[in-house]
Amino acid sequence: MGSVMSLGCSKRKATNQDVDSESRKRRKICSTNDAENCRFIQDESSWKHPWSLCANRVISVAAVALTNFRFQQDNQESNSSSLSLPSPATSVSRNWKHDVFPSFHGADVRRTFLSHIMESFRRKGIDTFIDNNIERSKSIGPELKEAIKGSKIAIVLLSRKYASSSWCLDELAEIMKCRQMVGQIVMTIFYEVDPTDIKKQTGEFGKAFTKTCRGKPKEQVERWRKALEDVATIAGYHSHSWRNEADMIEKISTDVSNMLNSFTPSRDFDGLVGMRAHMDMLEQLLRLDLDEVRMIGIWGPPGIGKTTIARFLFNQVSDRFQLSAIMVNIKGCYPRPCFDEYSAQLQLQNQMLSQMINHKDIMISHLGVAQERLRDKKVFLVLDEVDQLGQLDALAKETRWFGPGSRIIITTEDLGVLKAHGINHVYKVEYPSNDEAFQIFCMNAFGQKQPHEGFDEIAWEVTCLAGELPLGLKVLGSALRGKSKREWERTLPRLKTSLDGKIGSIIQFSYDVLCDEDKYLFLYIACLFNGESTTKVKELLGKFLDVKQGLHLLAQKSLISFDGERIHMHTLLEQFGRETSRKQFVHHGFTKRQLLVGARGICEVLDDDTTDSRRFIGIHLELSNTEEELNISEKVLERVHDFHFVRIDASFQPERLQLALQDLIYHSPKIRSLNWYGYESLCLPSTFNPEFLVELDMRSSNLRKLWEGTKQLRNLKWMDLSYSSYLKELPNLSTATNLEELKLRNCSSLVELPSSIEKLTSLQILDLENCSSLEKLPAIENATKLRELKLQNCSSLIELPLSIGTATNLKQLNISGCSSLVKLPSSIGDITDLEVFDLSNCSSLVTLPSSIGNLQNLCKLIMRGCSKLEALPININLKSLDTLNLTDCSQLKSFPEISTHISELRLKGTAIKEVPLSIMSWSPLADFQISYFESLMEFPHAFDIITKLHLSKDIQEVPPWVKRMSRLRDLSLNNCNNLVSLPQLSDSLDYIYADNCKSLERLDCCFNNPEIRLYFPKCFKLNQEARDLIMHTCIDAMFPGTQVPACFIHRATSGDSLKIKLKESPLPTTLRFKACIMLVKVNEELMSYDQTPMIVDIVIRDEHNDLKEKIYPSIYPSIYPLLTEHIYTFELDVEEVTSTELVFEFPQLNKRNWKIGECGILQRETRSLRRSSSPDLSPESSRVSSYDHCLRGD
């Protein structure tokens, strides 16, 4: 019986307290230096902001309300345990009586708008309070107050005559009281009324309010007035913004429905056992009250429940973070060793960002993108099943990649990976206690934590045989569920003789109860298709099995699960399936369908010259991670045949073995899936028969061509030859009428596609990215199902086919980097479903056809870097266009009035010299970037809409009217060599970047925004007063300087660390410091303008060398550009300071070329809260006091 019988299984029913107490003793919080040392730490709450209902990340009114509600709740509960779990009885905090309480003035809306929205609520199952049976009086009574308080959401429908009713005003006052006291969510609808009139009680609304207030007590009037002022500031739905009232109602009811879903407690984790103890331990490691970025490892054997714990933790705390994501089964997506490690890491990072920011088709070009996108975001990231350091390097290489307060959770079986990555916060997951194991088993066998009557004894016996492994308990319990006690008793003797507590025996039992067809499906998934989409598996195996029903049954038996569309089988189950397949050959020879998997299993079969000639159905061989040469008999390879599924990665293997393996294709005329990574031959064998082929995946191959002539391809659905850089041509594909995806990315030698492409009537995705030799596309007049066409960086492509207009279902067209493309066909306007059109860096393109005006579903038009583009079509209005980017279209002279719905307009680097008045009607416009031109002052209406201004090189002064740009956030003055001074500028500015302004001497201004960032690289003529102003009035700065200024009384003139002593008086909660560093070159041969950023950490330790903080500068986790004779300053907050001595260290990467020559620290004003909270001092007083403080040297 092995170790199972040593468990000493007890039938005693433990109390919850006993279970938790025992669990705590068995679980460890480990440091990587000593895996048995335990640490216990306290915790607090934090919160998450984004909650998006729309794919384009627009946050709805409902989402904002919900976020505020959650924030209030977090504030109210900040002193409680942040991971404390609700009991079943209290999982819903209140007994709600209604979903929605509407407050409205009946005469205005009851028979029109209100009746329609109530009907929409009814159709969506939203319970709305109706006051038909309440008798009206001068003031609202207890019944109505209870109805308001008992509603999850209050919707205030503000109309012109709303304030004419004292009843409505009393309702509103009560609603706003509930909002303040109990965090009730309040949504607003402004129906034919301006919020300003409500806030200020003006206009027709104000007249009605004045009339209602006559003769009323002053206290009551003030209560009404305060309620109106408050409700007017709540972002809501404006009827004036909607052309169609029905659309507005549908939007409101959908938002309300989605919000109500958040009130429904999750049942996804009901029935999990022992989670309270796991969360208590993890709480000590998470320390959500700290702003440091922390990585936590969850370490334990396979099947112990690491993934379940991580998912549960994610469910508990992820909504307190700005961004969150779970990356599952990472090791399955990252081969070892990796043929192209950089590409694999890039793909992993791409997947992470895609989930994190909800951008399905995100494209990244280098591994620094994650750091750039996430460095200021509070992130909760789970990295599941990590087994290589390279995976962590791709996804979470440094804590500086993420914003303050971020938490990265890594689950792994390998403690060495965590040690190598420097992760010293590790939670070791121990096996559950006897009582917990029994409850886990019972939950899966009986659907409750106790066995059914009469099953007590036998349930305990089976639990003991499961070896306390959660996966085994789950699988075995599911297998016995619903069976009679007699069936259990017949099964038990067999379990006792074959089970020794190992998971393989447990899975064997669950496997044996499957019918033969489901067993085959299980083995197919384990050996070939783990991680594949259900669609592909159904297509590939549908000929042999009832895949749909089989997948459903395997999922019920807990043998597989689904991650969206993809099938997931646990690693242990996969290992069991592969081992079972190998044993079948050993015990049964070729009497069963054979699946050859892994070098060991394949060698056992193929290294014996006596092996009979027999049929095989599938082979999965990964040899790229096998260093020793395999001894496979070539004679055997000649006799094994009839493979339907071939999956091989033989990279780095000897040519002899490569050629021998290719014989498998010769003798397999009915192949359905050929997946061969790094195929070495120049062409597939002439005898290769693709007639039955459904999937062809030959990525990173050495192919020059696939085959000669025309072959029958009627079953082919997926073809991927990406990264086959020597591929010069494709065969005739006219018979591939069912092909859905054709991927040829990075086939850089491919010159043209065959004309037979036009026969691909089922094609949905055509990916030709980086096919730099491709000169033309054939006609695609029959590609009516095409959804994505990717042609970016096809730099030799001269034109698009006229037939592209027949691709009426095309959603995304990317021709960025097609630098030889001169014009677009007029038929482009026939692609009426097009949503994203990217023409960036089409540097030869002169104009767009007027037919582009037909693209009424186009959301994004990106033409950045189209340097020859002279004009856009006129007299068109793309009603769906949201983003228009024309940056660096240097020949564009006319203003692009092609839509009135644009929210993001970028005209930097264009030759535009006017801003038409019509732009004022573009109500959605939120981001408007433009370069300066002399006549800009003639368009004062532009001053209220420009957010980013780029000044030209020849400018001699910044016009004084720039100060009037009330929304200006960014100002760039690069290479303005004649500029001598800066005048007073807009207080709205967040960022000024003045690079290489060689004559700039004075700053005749002050900066009233304490959060402003000022950068003046290579402005060497700046006088001392200007440099002092820059240094002391912003949170981040860069400017010329030869030494750390004397006002930094704590200085180190050599090295990158220094020690400071604080005053002995009581220390505040938070201390603020300004840090200053100056760089020196290590390599004197470097150019003075280094293009590589330098990463700088700030590590703060106390006198005991204990780490207090590890942070980075408040704007950049890296310094750029790197320049000598320049000063870099930035502010930082240090929280919970208890020591009177602090050591500041400035470790940096890129030390080969640069190092920190001098550094300094200046203690600023102290605050009890971080900068995100309300400051103690006004911006102006903060600026002056810190400036004086520095001059005095105190």
Swiss-Prot record:
Residues 1-27, 1170-1194 are annotated as: Disordered. LRR repeats lie at residues 623-647, 658-681, 690-713, 714-737, 739-760, 761-784, 786-807, 808-831, 832-855, 866-878, 879-899, 900-922, 943-965, 966-991. Residues 1171-1185 have a biased composition (Low complexity). SUPFAM superfamilies: L domain-like, P-loop containing nucleoside triphosphate hydrolases, Toll/Interleukin receptor TIR domain, Winged helix' DNA-binding domain. One of its GO terms (cellular component) is endoplasmic reticulum membrane. PROSITE patterns: TIR (PS50104). It catalyses: NAD(+) + H2O = ADP-D-ribose + nicotinamide + H(+). Residues 96-260 form the TIR domain. It holds the Pfam family LRR_3. Its EC number is 3.2.2.6. It comes from the Eukaryota. This is Probable disease resistance protein RPP1. It comes from Arabidopsis thaliana.
